[in-house]
């Protein structure tokens, strides 16, 4: 197998600081940050009567404005929204990028293995290039091969300092990986690339120090490429285990050590098996791998999600591992819910599908003949999420006989935090709130008299938090492992000088994801980045291909900024002009937007209102407005103790729901969730309970 159509991954798993029984944090970047086992929370599993959790979720995300702009069913924003939801972006391909931007011959960017290598024998030594996540630096370490199995090498650092491990436990851990984790994880998720770039079937497990205070271990897909593509590649399929005392790698055979191997091996398989543009699904799958290998007790991030159920499920934060713990928990719970509701075979199909995304899962269900019994139509992601939001509160209590639609069957879920707990003296209750998309606000309602719930939610939501957008503009879209391109031929054969003008708004993951303006004079075979007023040549992670846009336009809070680029060196020529974004697998931000493109000398102007001769690969012409959708549902505990679910019927995102408290209903839990994909701007709503 060659390494075409593959992207760069660096998956970091944070270490457990045992002394304080707490999660340390790790810097974001070209990273997957995965939390380790910690002391179990003192929050018990939800008992049978659905009592108050006794906790409330965090303060409002923003000072909200409830936008009530009418949205016609056939409006442009609805059709644009569907285009964005269904978009499949080109995959980041480091081999192709090396050919295009670095001039690497195509034959050297690929690899093949006509024969297997002889591999390494115990006692061999070699050097490795490693990353320190504390300061985003790289360093070189030397290691000795201490043990090997048919599919694993166990390397231990000898320089710059010697790592001392219990070699008997190391050998046993290697055998457990060989005999348990390796076959179990492959049976469910698929296979890693084997042999790899080194033409060796072994996975390299390297035990080192100096990779960062909060890093327990990581997998970097860069190591799967030839050095001609990435000079920092170790040219082998490998995991890094932080072996400093107190970290995962220092205690071979422990649950935290073995669960880390299971977690990272899933990432390695996924890199070969599927395109993973959604980090929350990728990390959820890695934690599912821990569970499938018998290490469910190490998945403690569910407690952080339970404390923050308003966490947006379908995104990831650019921050520390601790700050993203709730995202880990949400992703793991979603995979577990799918597993319990739809079964192992369907979830295995999702894990192995060519694209690991919400739309891919909907397709897996449809292809398997699974439909929504209420509509007799294929499921939507929003419908599944609505049921998931109920299951998170209900836990393992069965609501529908013979179905796990509203509950979990195989795991215990901590009680979800509530936004407020209300009783007789709290009514009438009025609140205006904002909640992240695909997050949930829970309100617990009790009382001796019936109440009426009135809801009014925003009908529209911004695509980007971009102020002063001038009508339509081009947007790169956003995803992990992506490479969106917008290309057009420019003819300057009749002019002696020329200037490229455009406005841009961008927010790209700091130091790892970049946007470029580039030109090709050979029909697109090779490309050169243009120097623009706000691009940077800084390259801390070997990811910048020249002069790229990174971070936020105009300061910490992105602003639209004007750009002017002298393209006189291309006067008298025809060439290809391209706007391009390249993102890694770790985190993605809102992306790259451009508007008011012009080259006055040839009377070219593009205000984003037409395709204007551009070839789009992943880019979409948009206006900065999306339709906002909502799910409002009540989990009712009847006077007989039976639990039912009732959904509010809404028109233009407004509706009323009567609840017979003090009569047929003993207590109720109101669950409010905005369900607009693509955006990370929260939805705002007004709630009245009288």
Residue ranges and their predicted role:
Residues 64-161:
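Acidic/polar low-complexity interaction segments
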Residues 20-23, 38-69:
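Ser/Thr-rich, Proline-interspersed low-complexity disordered segments
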Residues 357-485, 503, 511-518, 587-592, ...:
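Beta/coil-rich, acidic/histidine-enriched accessory regions frequently appended to metallopeptidases
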Residues 518-574, 622-631, 637-654:
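Exoplasmic/lumenal beta-rich domain surfaces
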Residues 4-19:
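N-terminal Sec-pathway targeting helices
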Residues 148-285, 295-316:
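Juxtacatalytic substrate-recognition/specificity segment
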Residues 226-234, 255, 259, 274-341, ...:
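Acidic/His/Gly-enriched intrinsically disordered linker/tail segments
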Residues 498-506, 575-582, 608, 670:
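Extracellular beta-strand-rich recognition modules
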């Amino acid at each position: 197998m060659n390494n075409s159509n593959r992207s760069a991954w660096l998956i970091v798993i944070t270490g457990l600081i045992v002394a304080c029984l707490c999660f340390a944090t790790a810097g974001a970047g070209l990273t997957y940050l995965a939390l380790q086992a910690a002391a179990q929370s003192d929050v018990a599993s939800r008992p049978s009567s659905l009592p108050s959790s006794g906790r409330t979720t965090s303060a409002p995300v923003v000072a909200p404005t409830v936008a009530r702009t009418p949205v016609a069913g056939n409006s442009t924003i609805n059709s644009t929204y569907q285009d964005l939801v269904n978009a499949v972006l080109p995959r980041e391909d480091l081999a192709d990028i090396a050919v295009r931007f670095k001039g690497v011959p195509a034959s050297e960017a690929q690899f093949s293995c006509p024969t297997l290598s002889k591999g390494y024998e115990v006692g061999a030594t070699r050097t490795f290039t490693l990353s320190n996540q504390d300061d985003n630096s790289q360093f070189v370490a030397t290691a000795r091969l201490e043990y090997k199995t048919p599919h694993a090498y166990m390397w231990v650092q000898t320089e710059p300092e010697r790592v001392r491990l219990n070699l008997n436990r190391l050998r046993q851990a290697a055998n457990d990986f060989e005999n348990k984790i390796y076959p179990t994880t492959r049976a469910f998720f698929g296979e890693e690339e084997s042999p790899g770039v080194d033409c060796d079937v072994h996975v390299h497990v390297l035990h080192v120090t100096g990779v960062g205070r909060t890093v327990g271990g990581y997998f970097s897909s860069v190591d799967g490429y030839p050095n001609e593509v990435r000079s920092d590649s170790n040219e082998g399929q490998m995991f890094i285990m932080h072996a400093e005392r107190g970290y995962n790698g220092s205690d071979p055979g422990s649950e935290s050590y073995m669960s880390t191997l299971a977690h990272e091996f899933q990432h390695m398989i996924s890199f070969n098996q599927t395109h993973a543009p959604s980090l929350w699904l990728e990390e959820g799958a890695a934690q599912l791998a821990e569970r499938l290998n018998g290490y469910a007790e190490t998945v403690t991030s569910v407690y952080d999600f339970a404390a923050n159920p308003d966490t947006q499920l379908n995104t990831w934060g650019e921050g520390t591992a601790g700050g993203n713990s709730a995202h880990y928990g949400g992703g793991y719970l979603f995979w577990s819910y799918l597993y319990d509701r739809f079964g192992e075979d369907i979830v295995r199909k999702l894990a192995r599908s060519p694209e690991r995304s919400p739309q891919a899962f909907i397709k897996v269900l449809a292809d398997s003949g699974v439909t929504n019994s209420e509509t007799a139509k294929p499921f939507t992601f929003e419908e599944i999420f609505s049921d998931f939001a109920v299951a998170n509160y209900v836990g393992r209590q069965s609501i529908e006989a013979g179905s796990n639609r509203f509950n979990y069957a195989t795991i215990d879920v901590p009680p979800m935090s509530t936004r407020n707990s209300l009783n007789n003296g709290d009514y009438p209750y009025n609140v205006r709130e904002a909640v992240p998309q695909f997050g949930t606000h829970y309100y617990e309602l009790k009382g001796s008299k019936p109440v009426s719930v009135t809801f009014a939610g925003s009908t529209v939501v911004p695509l980007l938090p971009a102020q002063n957008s001038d009508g339509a503009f081009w947007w790169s879209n956003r995803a992990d492992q992506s490479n969106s391109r917008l290309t057009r031929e420019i003819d300057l054969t009749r002019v002696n000088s020329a200037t490229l003008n455009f406005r841009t708004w961008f927010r790209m993951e700091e130091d790892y994801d970049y946007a470029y303006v580039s030109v090709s004079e050979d029909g697109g075979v090779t490309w050169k980045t243009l120097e623009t007023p706000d691009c940077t040549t800084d390259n801390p992670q070997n990811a910048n291909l020249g002069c790229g846009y990174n971070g936020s336009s105009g300061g910490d809070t992105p602003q639209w900024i004007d750009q002017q680029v002298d393209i006189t060196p291309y006067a008298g020529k025809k060439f290809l002009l391209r706007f391009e974004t390249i993102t890694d697998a770790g985190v993605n931000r809102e992306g790259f937007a451009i508007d008011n493109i012009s080259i006055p000398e040839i009377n070219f102007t593009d205000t984003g209102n037409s395709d204007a001769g551009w070839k789009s690969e992943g880019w979409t012409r948009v206006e900065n407005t999306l339709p906002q959708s909502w799910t409002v549902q009540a989990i009712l505990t009847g006077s007989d103790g039976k639990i039912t679910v009732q959904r509010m019927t809404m028109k233009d995102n407004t509706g009323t729901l009567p609840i017979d408290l003090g009569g047929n209903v003993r207590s109720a839990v109101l669950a409010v969730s905005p369900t607009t994909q693509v955006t990370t701007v929260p939805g705002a709503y007004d709630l009245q309970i009288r």
